[in-house]
Every structure is written in C-alpha cells, then in structure tokens.
A protein has these predicted regions:
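Rhodanese-like catalytic fold shared by cysteine-dependent sulfurtransferases
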Residues: 2-65, 71-75, 83-120, 126-193, ...
Length: 273
C-alpha cells in the first residue's frame, strides 16, 4: 500500500513538473511570437520617432487612395520601403526607392524624378512616416507637388476595390511570424564590447550598458553605400544590435538582411528601455 502511494506521489510530482515546463514553455513561445509580430507589425502604426525628424517648414500634402484611383494614370507611386518589404507586396506599377537612398544619394533622387516624368508623385510606405520624410526631401530640392499616403496600407486593405491595385502578399516582411527569430541576449556575461544602436536618433543608453562601445547606425536613414561601408568596418567580434523602440526593433530585421548579404550574421539583440 505504502509502495503504491509513493509511486502515485512520484508520478504526480513528475506529471506536475512536465505540466509546469509545458506552461512555461508555452508562455515563452507566446512571448517570442508576440514580440516578433510586434516588431514586424510596428511599421503599420505611425511613430513619433519619424515625426521628430520631419521639417515643420517643409509641409507635405496628404492624399487619399480614392483620389489616386480616380486619376490613376496620372499618378506615379514611389515606394520608399526596403527592398524586402517592396518585394513582399506593393501597389501595382510602383517604383522602389528606399528612404535612405533618397535622403543621401543625389543620383537616386534624379533617377527617380526622371522615371516619374510628368506624373504626379505619391510617396508610399505602410504608415506615412518614411514617405513624409522622402516627400519633404524631394520637394525641397525639385519643387512640385509631392503627395503622401497617410496610413496608406490601412486605406488599401480596408477597401475591396483598393485591394485590386495591390499585388503580392500583405505580409510586411518575408517569412512573417515564422521567420527565424534573432536571439535575445542579456547583458550579463556578454563578451562583445561593441553594440549597434539602430534607432533614428542617438540617445544616451541605460546604465546597464556601461563599459560598452555604442555605435549609432540608423540604417533606415542610410544609403546603400553608407550601410555597406559601415558593415565593412565591423570587426570580427559578434554583431549585437540594440532594440530600444518600435523603429529600432524593426530595423534589426533589416540590419540582419544587410549583414547576410555581406556574408555576416546578426548574433543577437539586446532590449533596452
């Protein structure tokens, strides 16, 4: 009898342990998936980080998708997102000139103007943040009327007619939530001495980063040449990125693409507040 009770008690303890592990594992898995989705989905919501960079003296003109559709053949859509975003899904016939190129590459700006011709220019990104910066830059140099689709993705996806002007997937980045997640690291025991800050504007880091060298690299605002030169300057130690905002966390995915294109890898990211 006592043997049976001991066996049952042992079985109960083991079962409880497995159940606890399953629950903890499930919570961790959910947290990882939720975090990945937040990182990717962040570009569908406007960010104060971009608005701080906008020139208040250089206003832009917002336009509705309904106005574009009504005069479709007289508009050209300039998609200022990253190539991976553009290749995943885009407005039909749109041109892809990423924001960093338009901000820093005069040849890219002139090529875009030449391709657009006499058509009215509409700058597009999912939320209107990057497109606002691009439109402001182009208007200051070339003049003309440059439109921005404010929350353009939402306008398109909420209307059956507008969706016919979209081609490809509605996922923001390749792989969606199934994309292999970049490891999230802790400062304790971290041997890398250099961390990459991907935020749009540099700001002092929290005290837990004391003793680390912080390199500011806002890749969404950098040209292709600037990004490649920066990556070429990195040493041989693991590449670790800081994720301290929606935009910088989103940028970790883009940074990872660029590293992989250069035969490197993003070893991990550290979240700070």
């Amino acid at each position: 009898m006592n043997t049976d009770k001991a066996t049952n008690r042992k079985t109960l303890i083991i079962s409880t342990a497995f159940l606890l592990l399953a629950v903890v594992g499930g919570v961790v898995f959910y947290a990882e998936v939720k975090d990945t989705l937040q990182m990717v989905e962040s570009e569908r919501q406007k960010s104060s980080e971009f608005s701080r960079l906008a020139d208040p003296q250089q206003p832009v003109h917002n336009i509705l998708m309904s106005d574009i559709v009504a005069d479709w053949n007289n508009f050209v859509i300039i998609d200022v997102r990253e190539p991976e975003e553009y290749n995943e899904g885009r407005l039909k016939g749109s041109l892809n000139y990423r924001l960093g190129e338009l901000l820093n590459n005069e040849l890219a700006r002139r090529n875009m103007i030449q391709q657009a011709g006499e058509k009215k220019r509409v700058f597009y990104c999912h939320d209107g943040d990057r497109s606002t910066l691009a439109a402001s830059r182009i208007e200051s140099e070339f003049g003309g009327t440059n439109y921005v689709m404010d929350l353009g993705f939402r306008q398109i996806q909420e209307n059956d007619e507008y969706r016919t002007y979209w081609e490809g997937s509605t996922d923001i980045l390749p792989g969606g939530k199934d994309y292999e997640r970049t490891p999230v690291l802790k400062m304790e025991g971290l041997t890398a001495s250099t961390l990459i800050d991907l935020s749009l504007q540099y700001k002092p880091q929290v005290r837990t980063l004391k003793g680390k060298t912080i390199i500011h690299a806002p890749i969404l605002l950098m040209s292709d040449a600037q990004i490649n030169a920066f990556i070429a300057s990195l040493g041989t130690e693991p590449v670790i990125a800081l994720c301290n905002s929606k935009v910088s966390c989103f940028s970790t995915r883009i940074f990872r693409y660029r590293l992989e294109q250069n035969g490197l890898k993003l070893s991990g990211l550290i979240r700070t507040k």
